Curated annotation (Swiss-Prot):
The gene is ureF. InterPro entries: UreF (IPR002639), UreF_sf (IPR038277). Gene3D superfamilies: Urease accessory protein UreF (1.10.4190.10). Required for maturation of urease via the functional incorporation of the urease nickel metallocenter. Disulfide bonds: none annotated. GO terms for cellular component: cytoplasm. It comes from Photorhabdus laumondii subsp. laumondii (strain DSM 15139 / CIP 105565 / TT01) (Photorhabdus luminescens subsp. laumondii). HAMAP family: UreF. It is found in: Cytoplasm. The keyword Mitochondrion does not apply. This is Urease accessory protein UreF. UreD, UreF and UreG form a complex that acts as a GTP-hydrolysis-dependent molecular chaperone, activating the urease apoprotein by helping to assemble the nickel containing metallocenter of UreC. The UreE protein probably delivers the nickel. It comes from the Bacteria. GO terms for molecular function: nickel cation binding. Its main location: cytoplasm. The lineage of its organism: Bacteria, Pseudomonadati, Pseudomonadota, Gammaproteobacteria, Enterobacterales.
Length: 228
């Protein structure tokens, strides 16, 4: 075990990392308003679906970006970044991934001083890169020596915790309920990592009509606790 790498992973996977994730519910708020999610069981199902969709789309791009960065192919990371952005069909998803991505890059370059992260932030500021959160995470953690599968674990954990943290504020669930759901979903992390490694960037799939419908409903909702 590399203790330094492990603690870096823990730091940047922390659900309270100041990148703005708390402002978004990843579709949960609309799902609750639409009566799709209404109890612990449906919350668990909703989160699992989000994890499956994330790993077959963003996860494959993260894996490909990490592999490209480890071989010095920085331009490929930019291409994978736009591949993610272009597959976000709704305004809410695009806003979430780019806002969080830029915040992560800004924070990480100040904290770590890594030249690769500084280069990435410059690409974002000059609009050469979209600066999506998944690829920014790949850049940051590759600069810190994390393996591609470790970055996928971080990405999947972030997806789950964005939804489950929002659930605490939106539903009558306890912290124990949330941890029980998370513990159960984490049993499949090896399968999620294997899925991310399948096919490469050309096999990204972003078909998630319910997510897009919920995002559209959220933008026009009369009351909202979370950002769009």
């Amino acid at each position: 075990m590399n203790a330094l790498r492990l603690i870096r992973i823990m730091q940047f996977a922390d659900s309270v990392l100041p990148v703005g994730a708390f402002s978004f519910s990843n579709g949960l708020e609309s799902a609750i308003q639409s009566k799709i999610v209404y109890d612990v069981a449906t919350l668990s199902d909703f989160t699992r679906t989000a994890l499956l969709q994330a790993v077959s789309s963003d996860g494959r791009a993260v894996m490909a970006a990490c592999q490209a960065l480890n071989s010095g192919q920085h331009d490929a990371a930019i291409s994978h970044d736009w591949a993610i952005f272009n597959r976000k069909l709704n305004e809410e998803s695009r806003t979430m991934v780019t806002r969080m991505g830029k915040k992560l890059a800004e924070m990480a370059v100040e904290v770590t001083g890594e030249s690769l992260i500084a280069w990435w932030l410059a690409q974002i500021k000059s609009d050469i890169a979209a600066g999506t959160y998944p690829i920014t995470l790949a850049v940051v953690m590759s600069a810190l020596g994390a393996a591609p599968r470790e970055v996928i674990v971080m990405h999947q954990y972030g997806v789950a915790m964005t939804i489950l943290s929002a659930a605490i504020r939106l539903m009558r669930v306890t912290h124990i309920d949330i941890q029980r759901i998370l513990f159960s979903l984490n049993q499949d992390i090896e399968l999620f990592c294997d899925e991310a490694e399948k096919g490469g960037i050309e096999q990204m799939t972003s078909y998630a009509p319910m997510t897009d419908v919920l995002a559209a409903l959220h933008v026009s909702a009369f009351t909202r606790l979370f950002s769009n």
